[in-house]
């Protein structure tokens, strides 16, 4: 294998600023490729058009561990968390910002609390645009908690959003924890079959990026996911059979149902 040089030709290429272009515009215009991307399963698009197939053997969060919520209306959630993984630099459009919204609900079929992905946004935005997005999403979802890791661009956003009256919280998953340690800290939730996602393309992008980690090209959605799920776990909203028994009772009075993001 070492004697071979791997040559990849992704259908869509990006420059350092994050601008997209077709590799062969005379044959595949960018607009047609984007339409093709929207019509294909994420894993097939990554493998066939981006030349980036990923084996599931090394996945820390396997796609098969996710549960798919097929109802168009999500369950009534007792507590919701919005989590943001901000780009490293405030004015760098080459980096992604990932904003996810999650809810915890009681599953009557399994008689325990489960987690569901309610919304996910992954975009390249400069700081003013990111701030506007966070404010609008907070108004739309009215989460019980909005958490940002105070590093790089997230620290500036944390201060700015708080000044505007949004009760954003600082959350550090663990001093010195690397990305793999964070994923390992929540992988049991997926393996136990208590994490759900709706059958929408944006949700499948989260599933595929988690499956591709740590060998995938991007991990922004992975960071936002682990941030929220570690908060659920550390806050005591979700318990597994392996957790130690205690006398604490968790839960917040039910909230009304809300449609998924489209």
Indicate where each model-derived feature is located.
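Mg2+-dependent endonuclease catalytic cores in nucleic-acid-processing enzymes, primarily RNase H-like
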Residues: 1-23, 27-35, 52, 56, ...
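ATPase catalytic-site recognition across NTP-hydrolyzing enzymes
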Residues: 16-87
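Helicase-core coupling region on the C-terminal RecA-like lobe
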Residues: 48, 53-56, 221, 241, ...
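Catalytic phosphate/metal-binding cores of nucleic-acid and nucleotide-processing enzymes, i.e., regions
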Residues: 74, 79, 103-106, 155
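An active-site-proximal beta-strand-loop segment
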Residues: 84-97
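Generic detector of well-ordered alpha-helical packing
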Residues: 86, 150, 220-221
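Charged alpha-helix within mobile-element recombinases
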Residues: 209-233
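Acidic two-metal-ion nuclease catalytic site recognized across multiple nuclease folds
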Residues: 228-262
